Design a protein with these regions (language model features):
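Phosphate-binding/switch loop-helix module in NTP-utilizing enzymes
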Residues: 34-99
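N-terminal phosphate/diphosphate-binding loop that engages ATP/GTP or pyrophosphate donors
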Residues: 1-53
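C-terminal boundary of histidine-terminating zinc-finger modules
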Residues: 183-192
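Conserved catalytic-core segment of NTP-binding enzymes
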Residues: 73-179
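A short acidic, helix-capping loop that chelates divalent metal ions and anchors anionic groups
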Residues: 66-67, 178-181
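C-terminal alpha-helix
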Residues: 197-212
Length: 221
């Protein structure tokens, strides 16, 4: 669980999809009728693990088998939880999705205020970023931005600008970050150029989120 160790969480939470009895109780059994909108408002407090900086982590897991996804009790449970988190939670919610576009095809990320694409310095990564922008628009995600990973901004930066994808910043390749990962330490403990860049990206991200918040409030008037 790389994300857990990055957050300084030594014992990551068990994936929610592994709680078969809970899913059956809330959403129904496999192969039969199931509840499309099960009760999920207590899941964060009961199954989330809090990191040293106050971040609460939940691991969803996956229930998709072949094709574009299944509609089953486990899937209904996870979708209901995501809707609850994005519509009812007062805190910021960050979804760390698998690399690629599969979650966009399943509509898992529908309703997000901002999609952040991590772009590697290569042609395939840029092609994926272009597809993500298109698919995000199709499911109603109005705002996307990119973070360039491992340096090599030059042509990557220019191509992202051509695509109309704002850039939050660039994380340079940093041996200190790699060493921290090998030692299962949170990146922030490593210091160095990469961490300094991440701090700047965080500041720009907060500014972007605030602008989106104001835009959303204005649209409701």
């Amino acid at each position: 669980m790389n994300l857990a160790s990055s957050l300084g969480i030594e014992n990551p939470p068990k994936p929610l999809v592994d709680f078969k009895d809970l899913i059956q109780e809330r959403a129904g059994a496999e192969g039969g009728a199931f509840i499309y909108n099960p009760k999920v408002d207590d899941i964060v407090d009961k199954y989330g693990v809090i990191g040293p900086d106050g971040v609460r982590m939940l691991v969803m897991g996956t229930v998709d088998k072949g094709g574009s996804g299944c509609m089953c009790p486990g899937s209904a449970f996870l979708r209901a939880l995501l809707r609850h988190l994005m519509l009812n939670e007062k805190s910021a919610v960050i979804l760390d999705m698998e690399a690629g576009i599969e979650h966009l095809g399943r509509g898992t990320t529908r309703g997000m205020d901002l999609m952040i694409i991590v772009v590697e310095p290569g042609a395939r990564s840029l092609e994926t970023a272009e597809r993500i922008k298109k698919l995000s628009s199709e499911i109603g995600i109005k705002h996307i931005a990119a973070v360039i990973n491992k340096g090599g901004a030059g042509k990557v930066n220019a191509r992202l600008e051509e695509l109309g994808i704002p850039i939050l910043g660039e994380i340079p390749f940093d041996q200190q970050l790699m060493q921290a990962d090998l030692e299962k330490r949170a990146p922030i403990e490593a210091g160095g150029e990469a961490v300094n860049a991440i701090v700047k990206i965080k500041e720009k991200l907060m500014e972007t989120v605030e602008e989106i918040r104001k835009e959303n409030e204005a649209s409701k008037k």
